[in-house]
């Protein structure tokens, strides 16, 4: 991969007509493309070979890599190419990615225009770079950052005749993420890196992003299981330290969570579980054991689903979007069990009252002998609309029967859940759009 990238570097510089005199404004540079256009198959007479140039620059001129090349200060131009973002870990709040970092600066002590070079530029490795002055830049907020060594140290150095130095590193970096799960799973997450010179303040080394339209860009499409890449933001800040002011180059990568997986794993099973719990309203007031088993199993299913989702998320002290969904869903199932308890209580009360009524009725039956010898019975009178075989006196007088409660519940529960869905989805989708708009306005500003 590194050979493919390095082979494309001259093409990138030619096609974009990159002018280092614009990138590094601290000194007047000659466009490096003029050197790359130079045909190496037509070498000038008595040209100087690469090894001789390096030997003269580093050994014959008293080059000192510990001294800043320009007393008035250096300007280092930075560009980052993202090769891959491999993972985002929400439990540890970090992300991993492979990147190429390109740094460009002007070192007048490395000017070899007068040496009649055989090539328009010199392509060198990290061994030569170790002998040159460098800005000692690093990611100051990274958890881990290391240059790839597969199979050799992945450092590319290009030296131009006018003293322009371009260094490219292939780095694996683990950076921090500031996770806000309040809108989870309809959320956006930000991960950031801060790049600066570790040893030099801005009076000695000025760090700035490339003038390219996108100083940080992707070499290929980023594919992650849970996230899509939404936006890459770059910013240059000046931060005070006890030793002076430092230039910091901030890059913020914003990810948008893929919602479909959570809908399939959390929301869809919850819908089905709640719909199943409503079946108990149609089983009748006498099927208490079956309705109890159905309600309890529904509650256990939704609790298990909730625990399975929360196991992969960090513990936070605020309420997440999915917490609201699961808690309200469990409340609906719990309320269906409360409705079942009320119906069961009324059925039991009805049964006890029926037995008492039957005893009372049997005691109130009087037998009277008629003139024709026929025995007639006088029974206890019930209120109008009630029968002694099906209703207790309390349910008759109040109008609330188990059947009526089930009938009302079969309408009110779906209606209430429908209203909750409208409020829930409108709020969290609207909130997500507000977050997006704020991020876009920040980029435009």
From Swiss-Prot:
Highest taxon above the source species: Eukaryota
Main location: membrane
UniProt topological domain (Extracellular) ranges: 27-258, 308-326, 429-445
Keyword terms: Cell membrane, Chloride, Chloride channel, Disulfide bond, Glycoprotein, Ion channel, Ion transport, Ligand-gated ion channel, Membrane, Signal, Transmembrane, Transmembrane helix, Transport
Annotated tissue distribution: Expressed in RIA, RIG, PHA and AIZ glutamatergic neurons, URX and RIH cholinergic neurons, and in male-specific MCM neurons.
Disulfide bond sites: 177-191
Family per similarity comment: Belongs to the ligand-gated ion channel (TC 1.A.9) family.
Protein name: Acetylcholine-gated chloride channel subunit acc-2
Species of origin: Caenorhabditis elegans
Taxonomic lineage: Eukaryota, Metazoa, Ecdysozoa, Nematoda, Chromadorea
């Amino acid at each position: 991969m590194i050979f493919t990238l390095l082979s494309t570097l001259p093409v990138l510089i030619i096609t974009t007509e990159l002018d280092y005199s614009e990138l590094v404004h601290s000194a007047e540079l000659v466009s490096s493309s003029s050197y790359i256009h130079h045909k190496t198959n037509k070498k000038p007479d008595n040209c100087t070979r690469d090894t001789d140039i390096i030997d003269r620059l580093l050994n014959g001129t008293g080059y000192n890599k510990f001294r800043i090349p320009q007393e008035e200060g250096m300007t280092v131009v930075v560009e980052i190419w993202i090769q891959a973002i491999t993972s985002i870990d929400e439990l540890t709040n970090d992300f991993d990615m492979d990147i190429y970092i390109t740094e460009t600066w002007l070192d007048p002590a490395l000017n070899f225009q007068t040496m009649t070079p055989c090539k328009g530029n010199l392509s060198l490795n990290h061994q030569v770079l170790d002998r040159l002055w460098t800005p000692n830049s690093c990611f100051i907020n990274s958890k881990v950052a290391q240059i790839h060594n597969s199979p050799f140290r992945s450092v590319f150095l290009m030296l131009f005749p006018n003293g322009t130095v371009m260094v490219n590193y292939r780095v694996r970096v683990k950076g921090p993420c500031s996770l806000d799960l309040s809108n989870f799973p309809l959320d956006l997450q930000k991960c950031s890196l801060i790049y600066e010179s570790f040893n030099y303040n801005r009076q000695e080394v000025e760090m700035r992003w490339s003038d390219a339209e996108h100083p940080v860009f992707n070499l290929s499409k980023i594919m992650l299981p849970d996230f899509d890449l939404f936006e890459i933001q770059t910013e240059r800040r000046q931060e005070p330290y006890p030793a002076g002011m430092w230039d910091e180059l901030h890059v913020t990568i914003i990810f948008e969570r893929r919602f479909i997986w959570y809908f399939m794993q959390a929301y869809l099973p919850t819908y089905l579980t709640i719909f199943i719990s409503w079946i108990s309203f149609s089983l009748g007031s006498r099927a208490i054991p079956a309705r109890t088993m159905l309600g309890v199993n529904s509650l256990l299913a939704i609790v298990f689903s909730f625990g399975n989702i929360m196991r992969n998320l960090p513990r936070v002290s605020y309420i997440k979007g999915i917490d609201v969904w699961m808690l309200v869903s469990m409340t609906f199932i719990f309320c269906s069990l409360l409705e079942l308890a009320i119906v069961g209580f009324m059925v039991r009360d009805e049964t006890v009252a029926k037995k008492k009524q039957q005893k009372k009725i049997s005691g109130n039956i009087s037998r009277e002998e008629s003139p024709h010898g026929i025995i007639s019975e006088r029974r206890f009178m019930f209120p109008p609309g009630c029968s002694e075989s099906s209703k207790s006196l309390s349910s008759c007088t109040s109008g609330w029967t188990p059947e009526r409660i089930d009938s009302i519940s079969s309408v009110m529960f779906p209606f209430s859940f429908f209203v909750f869905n409208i409020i829930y989805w409108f709020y969290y989708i609207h909130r997500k759009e507000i977050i997006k708009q704020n991020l876009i306005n920040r980029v435009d500003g």
